[in-house]
Design a protein with these regions (language model features):
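TRNA-recognition modules of translation machinery and tRNA-sensing kinases, especially anticodon-binding
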Residues: 1-205
Length: 205
């Protein structure tokens, strides 16, 4: 076939805060719900006095300017996500990844989904997200939808996000220690690793 010239695709919805289209009021609808949790990591620690390991869960809307929305509620531009960001010590990340992968698979079974229509599939190297580290752990819980090829489509992903997000917020905010956890018993600070189960509530319907 004939190739066109490269074009830039915007996968985020752009809007303006307020009634006027003022460039200084440009805003974007969030493409995922997770970053609000990472941005408020320190606030949760200071107000709740939680100790690692602990998790922050939420459910909310996300928006993606999908190039080809299709398959009913499977791929849409507005969707509901339910996520857990579970903060752990780096040395315990593998054990917690295994724990949450098993827990989440069993949860889908517990609400009545037959094992015949459900599978757990580790992601390949080419599928890993930018925050995932090869070998750290990233799997999809998939359902046999009638409209997905080759028969299974993602219901939920369980990912070991390492300390990628907290380090990014620390670097770009200039407040490094704010995104570290202070271990009082060992008297040291470190960036926790994150295990993230992230499910599509619409797809689960």
């Amino acid at each position: 076939g004939t190739l066109t010239e490269p074009r830039q695709f915007n996968l985020m919805f752009k809007t303006y805060v307020g009634a006027l289209e003022d460039p200084s009021a440009t805003a974007y609808l969030r493409p995922e719900t997770a970053q609000g949790i990472f941005a408020n990591f320190r606030n949760v620690i200071d107000t709740s006095r939680v100790k690692i390991p602990f998790g922050i869960a939420q459910i909310g809307k996300a928006f993606r300017n999908e190039v080809t929305p299709r398959n009913y509620i499977f791929r849409s531009r507005e969707f509901e996500q339910m996520e857990l960001e579970f903060f752990v010590h780096p040395d315990e990340a593998k054990a917690w990844y295994d724990f949450w992968t098993k827990q989440r698979y069993q949860w889908w079974q517990s609400i009545g989904i037959s094992s015949d229509n459900l599978r757990l599939r580790p992601q390949t190297k080419d599928e890993l997200a930018h925050y995932a580290k090869e070998g750290a752990g990233s799997s999809d819980i998939e359902y046999r939808f009638p409209f997905t090829d080759p028969g299974f489509g993602e219901l939920e992903g369980v990912a070991h996000r390492t300390d990628y997000d907290l380090r990014q917020h620390a670097e770009h905010s200039g407040q490094g220690d704010r995104f570290k956890y202070f271990d009082q018993e060992k008297n040291n600070r470190y960036f926790p690793h994150v295990i993230e189960p992230s499910a599509g509530a619409d797809r689960g319907a």
